[in-house]
Amino acid sequence: HYEAQLPFVIYRKPKAESFFSLLQKDDKLHVNNDLSEAGFVFAPFDSNQNIVLIPDSNSLSFEIDLSQGLNVIPTDFASDKTPDLHNRADHIKLVEKGIHAIKRGDLHKVVLSRKESLEGIAWDSFMDIFTRMLSNYPTAFVYVWFHPKVGMWAGATPETLLHLDGNKIQTMSLAGTQLYKEGKI
């Protein structure tokens, strides 16, 4: 699907033994700002930007059992290089800044994450990264999302947005979630 430049998402739910794929049939950019249509939503942090949807109604979907071929995944994804002290120092400063903001009452929760931008990466390399994320983060929601008009994103998050247990729903705030204050966004 990537070679044909058609939108798709591949994801695994936390602790799941299978992963899912949703393959859009065309390259149309579907926007669904009112969340009225079923599919996989990719929403930006900026609420002024459009919510992109890979719609169920215009996609093929598959579930793949991880024991059927991806059970032997390399676990040596972590680099054995010496950590870059400059990046480590920047990270420590960022943690300290977050702690001070919490103590001042400006923030109640801070989540630091790593970001890497890769340009010109081959599809085989990206699938290798995805399979390593599956192995290294078994309790996380792991995904690769692609749209030729938006780009490719991959990630792993341990946070649960919504958990359904019978008729009981539990939720928690995710990174970036802030308390609503009248007149402030």
Predicted regions and their residues:
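A short, Trp-centered hydrophobic/proline-enriched beta-strand micro-motif
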Residues: 6-13, 108-110, 140-145
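Short, surface-exposed beta-edge/turn micro-motifs
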Residues: 5-8, 36-40, 139-141, 151
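Secondary-structure boundary elements
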Residues: 92, 100-106, 135-137, 146-150, ...
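Non-catalytic accessory segments adjacent to catalytic cores
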Residues: 11-120, 124-125, 166
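SIR2/sirtuin-family catalytic core signature
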Residues: 122-165
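Short, structured patches in soluble enzyme cores that scaffold and shape functional sites
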Residues: 45, 114-116, 145-149, 156-158, ...
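Cytosolic ligand/metal-binding cores
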Residues: 23, 35-37, 163-185
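Sequence termini and other peripheral, non-core segments
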Residues: 1, 6, 14-18
